[in-house]
Amino acid sequence: MIAEERIREKVYRLKATYALRSVSILGSYAEGRATENSDIDLLVEFEQPTVSLLKLNSLKYDLEDTLGIPIDVIHAPLPAGSMIRPSKIVRIL
């Protein structure tokens, strides 16, 4: 399991590159039940409301390369009626 502070540091280093407005952790990492097999679920809001799939995937792969763990990047804000309903959100940026 990766410490929240390490995730925060890596995300902060990519803030300018990807024009990140906010990043939050969801899922097992946010709920404190992550295991060594868990991925990291990130809810990401960009400075621009519209972001290309290429940019989302680039962010995902940059984070996976630096953290060495699978990452799921979810574009924020979540739309009304979204199937994703996190029980806990931990803002890291």
Predicted stretch roles:
Residues I25:
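Conserved histidines in hydrophobic membrane contexts and catalytic metal-binding motifs
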Residues D39-D41:
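Structural signature of the urease/amidohydrolase superfamily beta/alpha-barrel
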Residues M1-S22, A30-E36, E47-L93:
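Catalytic core of pol beta-like nucleotidyltransferases
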